[in-house]
């Protein structure tokens, strides 16, 4: 440990691991797909469409560009972290109470927030055996137990997921379309689960 000018302490790399939670030490790092420029250079191609990260290959619509240009003068201010306007629009569109809506900055953020808010140590979190890896990693970070259900023809086996519910189950993750298999389940199938 070395002190530095600001009055705090700098901990060398060999000590950093001692600060990390055991639940995080056991996780394999998430490795995202290669950046577009790297793929272009490696394979000597000009156009790459990256589907793995849900990126829009067409860019913003003109409507979005117009809205952004109108907001440029207030870009120095923090946005509404409670997403009041967005919640009001969603509530109006689906005729539900705005207090039932939870917004976040992308799925990674929402998954993490759900796990931190809902899961206690040793609670169970049900998911497909092959699905978005953030469900399992965030479940493990909070000390909960991922319950992985085998796939059925590369699809989430919804019936088996429902059968796996116990008194320790706090979260069931339905990825639709499922990442990485791309398979889907219908609205009718989902409603049948909710009604159980």
Ranges and model annotations:
Residues 1-5, 33, 106, 182:
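Glycine-centered small-residue hotspots that permit tight backbone geometry or close packing
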Residues 1-15:
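N-terminal amphipathic/basic-hydrophobic helices that include classical n-h-c signal peptides
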Residues 4, 25, 38, 73, ...:
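Alpha-helical structural elements
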Residues 12-106, 113:
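N-terminal small-domain helix-loop-helix segment of the aminotransferase-like
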Residues 76-195:
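Conserved core of the PLP fold type I
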